[in-house]
């Protein structure tokens, strides 16, 4: 079975949906003329369906007058195309309203009668926009340009960006006679004479300009009103009061800052003395016994301990722990308050040297095998 027939069977007969020319052409990727032909062939094989026709042609009584220009005469009896949607029952009545030469095509197919054609109107509007009110023969006859895709251009006036002109008093421009010399007189003279004259004239004008501007200037600020004696006294009293208030505020702020500094220094001194008195010197090392040239006791050593905090994370802290010791008396040269962070370690290399010196009779293996 062909693809278009299978699609129409499923959509129109099985699903009872409306299929238009545009739907079929988009689904099968074909032209609208080919889609109209497929709808006509499918309706001939299935007479029980309800077709919707599209009729377009020139109406009998509806005619308009088209004006090309204001000066030219209007084109009378200009033809206008009309588009009508109808079902099979009202087809003959709609065709009778149009002149001969109209065209009738099947625009849509459905399995049930359709009473309202509003959902099909947008597609009809698109078809109507493609047609034009005039033909190429009319363009040749009346002399206007024929183009189906032409759109009248609407020109917008740009807003004026120029600021309104200021009212400046017009002055008569004084031109020196030296500037307006004829070309005949300047032929045999120096080339730079004209430039020198222009510089001199410009310098004279610049000297005159400030005097003229000074005359034209008007006082911008209004004249001060004459104050009475009572108003002057009140103003002077207000100034004196404001000055006294400013001086009092500045002196009080200076005294307050000095008092704050003294209080903070005293507070820091008190904290320092309290900390010193609260933390007496604790013994870092305690000797329990001394016998046989050896000292035995315990001392505080700093060690790192890992603990868990409230959230369960491991935290390393540095703590002081008592550790017992036993050492020779002559080694300890410090007092009892000495803190020993690291335990004393004996070098292994020195031990080996001492043992080698203590056994002079020991010989190497090579010397033993060398002598026989």
From Swiss-Prot:
Keyword set includes Nucleotidyltransferase: yes
GO biological process, any: cell division
Disulfide bonds: none
Composition bias, Polar residues: 160-173, 355-365
GO molecular function per UniProt: DNA-directed DNA polymerase activity
Alphabetized UniProt keyword annotations: Cell cycle, Cell division, DNA replication, DNA-directed DNA polymerase, Mitosis, Nucleotidyltransferase, Nucleus, Phosphoprotein, Transferase
Keyword Nucleotidyltransferase appears in the UniProt entry: yes
The protein's name: DNA polymerase delta subunit 3
Organism: Schizosaccharomyces pombe (strain 972 / ATCC 24843) (Fission yeast)
The gene coding this protein: cdc27
């Amino acid at each position: 079975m062909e693809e278009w027939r299978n699609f129409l069977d499923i959509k129109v007969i099985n699903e009872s949906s409306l299929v238009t020319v545009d739907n079929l052409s988009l689904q099968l990727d074909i032209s609208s003329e080919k889609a109209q032909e497929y709808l006509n062939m499918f309706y001939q094989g299935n007479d029980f369906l309800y077709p919707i026709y599209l009729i377009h042609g020139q109406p009998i009584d509806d005619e308009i007058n088209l004006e090309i220009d204001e000066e030219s005469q209007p084109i009378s009896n200009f033809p206008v195309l009309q588009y009508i949607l109808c079902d099979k029952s009202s087809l003959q009545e709609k065709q009778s309203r149009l002149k001969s030469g109209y065209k009738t095509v099947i625009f849509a197919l459905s399995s049930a009668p359709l009473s309202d054609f509003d959902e099909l109107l947008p597609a009809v509007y698109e078809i109507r926009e493609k047609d034009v009110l005039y033909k190429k023969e009319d363009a040749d006859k009346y002399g206007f340009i024929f183009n189906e895709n032409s759109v009248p251009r609407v020109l917008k006036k740009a807003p004026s960006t120029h600021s309104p002109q200021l009212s400046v008093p017009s002055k008569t421009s004084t031109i020196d006679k030296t500037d307006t010399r004829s070309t005949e007189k300047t032929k045999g003279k120096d080339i730079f004479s004209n430039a020198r004259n222009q510089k001199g004239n410009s310098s004279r004008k610049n000297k005159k300009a400030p005097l003229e501007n000074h005359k034209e200037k008007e006082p911008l600020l209004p004249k001060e009103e004459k104050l009475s004696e009572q108003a002057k006294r009140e103003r002077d009293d207000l100034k004196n009061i404001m000055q006294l208030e400013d001086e009092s505020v500045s002196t009080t702020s200076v005294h307050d800052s000095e008092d704050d500094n003294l209080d903070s220094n005293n507070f820091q001194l008190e904290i320092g003395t309290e900390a010193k008195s609260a933390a007496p010197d604790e013994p870092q090392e305690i000797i329990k016994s001394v016998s046989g040239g050896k000292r035995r006791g315990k001392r505080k050593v700093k060690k790192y301990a890992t603990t868990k905090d409230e959230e369960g994370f491991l935290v390393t802290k540095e703590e002081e722990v008592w550790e017992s010791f036993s050492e020779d008396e002559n080694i300890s040269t410090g007092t009892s308050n000495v803190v020993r962070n690291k335990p004393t370690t004996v070098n292994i290399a020195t031990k080996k040297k001492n043992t080698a010196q203590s056994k002079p009779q020991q010989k190497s293996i090579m010397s033993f095998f060398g002598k026989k």
